[in-house]
Amino acid sequence: MKLKSLLVSLGLLAGAAAVQAEEPLKVGFIYVGPVGDLGWSYEHDMGRKGLEEYFGDKIKTTFVENVPEGADAERVITQLAKAGNDLIFTTSFGFMNPTVKVAKRFPNVKFEHATGYKLDKNLGTYVLRTYEGRYISGVAAGMMTKTNTIGYIGSFPIPEVIRDINAAYMGAKSVNPDVKMKIVWANTWYDPGKETDAANALMDQGVDVMLQHTDSPAPLIAAEKRGLRAIGQASDQSKFAPNAHIFSVRDNWTPYYIKEVQAVMDGTWKSQDFWGGFHDDMLTLASINPNLPTEVRAKIDATHDAIKSGAFKPFTGPIKDNKGNIAVPADHSLTDVELAQVNWYVEGITDEIPR
């Protein structure tokens, strides 16, 4: 009788284990903006949808949008962990410290933070080499400007944004030694009203080609209304400004998300600092305007191909900062660690970094 009961119990346990093994992997996402921002958060959510399409019923995804950076983020990340998510992606720089705190409290959950630099056993980081796209954007802007004044809408003065401002200006200077750059800080990732105000402030100063590090298409729309030019951010924003739009630098998160989810399923996931870019198609140039001058299109393509192949790295010295100091020595290319710590403007930018 005891043996029979034991066998029944073992059978039940085996059945339960089989059911448990078939349960989908739970993956959570937290976004700083709305999924409809048609920029940064939108493309992360496209990556989430790409996961669902690839894995089908093997996974179950959850997302929370419009989460402010700070205490609210810690609360939402905690809720995602308590809800049984096996892997959580936190997709904004300001989610870094909240993610670190929650990861320590949930050692059996795996976390990945976008654009950050703090690692732990169960916490990895991932970032795009957006500076590659900014350099090409600068090349296009430097060739297209008629006023020799291009503009950049910054979000927050963090290394990623400062690095990209530098890359854009270096790209512009490589084709136009006389070009100047104006910078306006919106102090937001996503706020169409503030982004429009920033765009108009730049154009009022003589800027005729704009770049942005904010997430809505508002700057492009503003440029379209005034007959000027702009470059899209994070997603294909061409439909909002068919005449103003030069091209968009599109983020493609799907390959990375698939790779990391598969690693969790295979038991091979590990904490790492991952950088993706043109070389692995995590960055692409979207909807290049067909009406660009032939020489501009040729230079865009050539610069893209050189960066994608690794033949050219934008942050290769000698590079001086705007104080006259050597920021990057001759024949040295900034390492990923160094790229993550850029806190200086390149020579020629006359603005000061807000502190």
Model-derived features with residue positions:
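Gram-negative bacterial Sec-dependent N-terminal signal peptides
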Residues: 1-21
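A residue-level marker of the well-folded mature domains of exported/periplasmic proteins
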Residues: 22-355
